[in-house]
Amino acid sequence: MPHSVCCIVRAKSSPESDRMPYDKDEHNMKLNWVTNRKTTGINRKHDHIAFVLQGGGALGAYQAGAYEELGSTPYQPDWVVGVSIGAINAALIAGNPPQRRVERLLEFWHLVSSGILLLTDAMPVSPWLKSGGELTEPRSAFNQFSAWQAALMGIPGFYQPRIPPPAFQPDGSPGALSVYDTGPLRATLERLIDFDLINSQQVRLSLGAVNIRTGNSHYFDNLDTKIGPEHVMASGALPPAFPPVTIDGEAYWDGGILSNTPLQHVLDMRKKSRSVLVFQVDLFSARGSIPINFEEVLKRQKDILYSSRTRYTSNMVAEIVNTRKAISSLLAKLPQELLDDAEVRHLAEVTNVAPVDLVHLIYRQGPYELESKDYEFSRVSILERWEAGRRDLRDTLTHPEWLKSAGQTAGATQYDLTQHSRPLRGEGEMPARRPETTVVPSVTP
């Protein structure tokens, strides 16, 4: 939540050196090539490809960069799931035809980073600000200043401060419930997203929110709900910064305050007979060092708070895999007459689940990033995060062997193939630094 105040000069133009790393003609050329070719190198065919996006504010540019790379490969997602900023990215993907998705993502991230001081190669300070390098203190100061500006001035096309502030607004009014007005975001969503396309269900879209009255997680899914901008805004209504969104008489907040990683929704809601390849793009890392100052305490707390659901899910389903193994082993020892029993047949059915392959990308923050990183929208930081997403997804896809583990018959195999991991050592094998190699989804009828 923004909590400090500072003013930085607004930029009036976008120099060539600060444009998003996107070549429309090149992207469309690769997309056409992918559309017209056969994916002959893939041994295992997945029934679904899901793109699962965590919440994380300004860090969401990493997800947009990852999609730019993914969108020019054979792995076009047919199911996009998001929470908070992940819901906005997800709606931009599902709400545009393939050839326009990156263009629309680019427009959104260009817009929300247009109000902060831009850095150009003509500025003498830009080399150390752009690269970070060993000069972390100047870059950290710049990042903090841009976060302060976002807190004071708002973000173009996203949110603006309420005047007067909430303390001076009448109880029960929208202005009394949040620091910022998200009216600009609604206008942005209506301009950049084709909601008729979303509701045609060509791509499944699931958006996570929290019902304020019940405290339960709720997913708006275009398979059973007519999606509009209000559903996207409900998923990103993080209190107390943003106001709740009321839909059909129920008020909703940001899904991230309960579960910031929507992986469990995919595992629960998929048909157990359908295999799925999941690209999960997280913005907060569960792993980190012990803080040595108060700023690091705040940053580490936020990382743990918003990444813990992924670890919880992995630990929970790892326990289920042992139960499945025990059941399968027991069933194999039963005589034929018992195998015909209705209860035994039910056990055999629920333990026979199509595989889930989980490709896990996690944003690795720079040493100069602070606790305010999720509301630090400077153009230079957005560009870096976008490029990091492209790079990590590209590096992941240089290991096609992770799709060729045809021997897997159940459960989910998890791969973390980013630049901080060692290359795969064999088919279906995890890098050594990630000991939790196999997990299994919960089973639903």
PLM regions and their residue ranges:
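Small-residue-rich anion-binding loops in enzyme active sites
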Residues: P21-I49, V210-R213
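Hydrophobic/aromatic beta-strand patches that form the interior of the parallel beta-sheet core
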Residues: V81, G208, L277-V281, D357-L361
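Cysteine-centered motifs
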Residues: C6-C7
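C-terminal helical/tail subdomains of lipid-metabolizing enzymes
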Residues: Q169-D171, A176, P184, L189, ...
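Acidic, Ser/Thr-rich peripheral helices and adjacent loops at domain boundaries
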Residues: I292-L330
